[in-house]
């Protein structure tokens, strides 16, 4: 897929990876970009910088997502690419409240589902369209110190796989973005932001922290190649291959790595058992 001449919608587009993609799409010739974010001021500012449209929206509100899709199709034109990108991270293991998991599932999984079922009928009717869903390397591997993040990002990857398998014959292409650490506000947006600094939960930065521009470069290459996995950190492909080759060995290695990342009295197991 080439973005030139296409209309794109980007959720979580006011900052971080989303903003980087908005700016890159514009630079590479997108006809129009709709910037969606719960931060209305930020969405409008980013949209104004690229001559696009800024819209405030809670991505867990299905009616609001459907309205954005319908309005864009009616007033701007056919959506060629929908980027479902909003997300955040928290600390917690088995002891964490189920309500926290429910909220994260809404943002990381249901938001992707709502977008897909709003936009795919339009795309299928035209015989073409592209979905780019942001997940995480945690969705292919795991996430030390955040059970909810690991669960929901795996679910996000699974949802993207299902959509690709089920709607591919209708001309729907799907890619899933699975980065490790990126300079963004995903941690600062977390209710556990202060607690996360300097803990083993920051293992995602072990292979370096990329800029949003770095991620955008990888995304554009993947879109052109229509590649399902978008891996800004090349090391992730090797980790996934090792996991697939011998999952028991991989789990053992992850156990040892997690043990080295947390002081014994702060190990995630102690959050439930106390020791």
What is the meaning of each model-derived region?
Residues 40-41, 57-67, 98:
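The beta1-alpha1 cofactor-binding region of Rossmann-like NAD(H)/NADP(H)-dependent oxidoreductases
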Residues 30-45:
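Conserved glycine-rich Rossmann-like NAD(P)H-binding loop of the short-chain dehydrogenase/reductase
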Residues 116, 152:
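Active-site helix of classical SDR
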Residues 28, 141, 162-173:
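Active-site-adjacent segment of SDR/Rossmann-fold oxidoreductases
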Residues 166-234:
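SDR active-site lid
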Residues 66, 88-102, 145-148:
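Conserved mid-core segment of classical short-chain dehydrogenase/reductases
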């Amino acid at each position: 897929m080439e973005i030139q001449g296409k209309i794109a919608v980007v959720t979580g587009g006011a900052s971080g990876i989303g903003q980087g993609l908005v700016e890159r799409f514009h630079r590479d010739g997108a006809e129009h970009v709709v910037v969606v974010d719960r931060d209305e001021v930020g969405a409008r500012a980013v949209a104004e910088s690229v001559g696009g449209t800024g819209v405030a929206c809670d991505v867990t509100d299905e009616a609001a997502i459907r309205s954005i899709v319908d309005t864009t199709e009616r007033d701007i034109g056919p959506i060629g690419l929908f980027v479902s990108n909003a997300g955040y991270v928290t600390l917690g293991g088995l002891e964490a409240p189920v309500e926290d998991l429910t909220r994260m599932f809404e943002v990381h999984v249901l938001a992707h589902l709502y977008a897909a079922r709003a936009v795919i009928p339009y795309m299928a009717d035209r015989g073409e369209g592209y979905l780019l869903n942001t997940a995480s390397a945690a969705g292919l591997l795991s996430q030390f110190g955040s059970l909810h993040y690991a669960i929901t990002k795996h679910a996000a990857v699974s949802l993207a796989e299902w959509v690709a398998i089920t709607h591919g014959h209708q001309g729907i292409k799907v890619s899933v973005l699975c980065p490790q650490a990126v300079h963004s506000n995903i941690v600062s947006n977390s209710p556990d932001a202060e607690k996360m600094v300097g803990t083993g939960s920051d293992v995602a930065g072990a292979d370096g922290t990329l800029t949003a521009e770095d991620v955008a470069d990888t995304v554009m290459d993947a879109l052109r190649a229509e590649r399902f996995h978008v891996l800004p950190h090349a090391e992730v492909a090797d980790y996934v291959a090792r996991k697939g080759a011998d999952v028991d060995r991989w789990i053992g290695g992850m156990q040892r790595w997690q043990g080295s990342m947390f002081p014994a009295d702060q190990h995630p197991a102690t959050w439930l058992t106390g020791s």
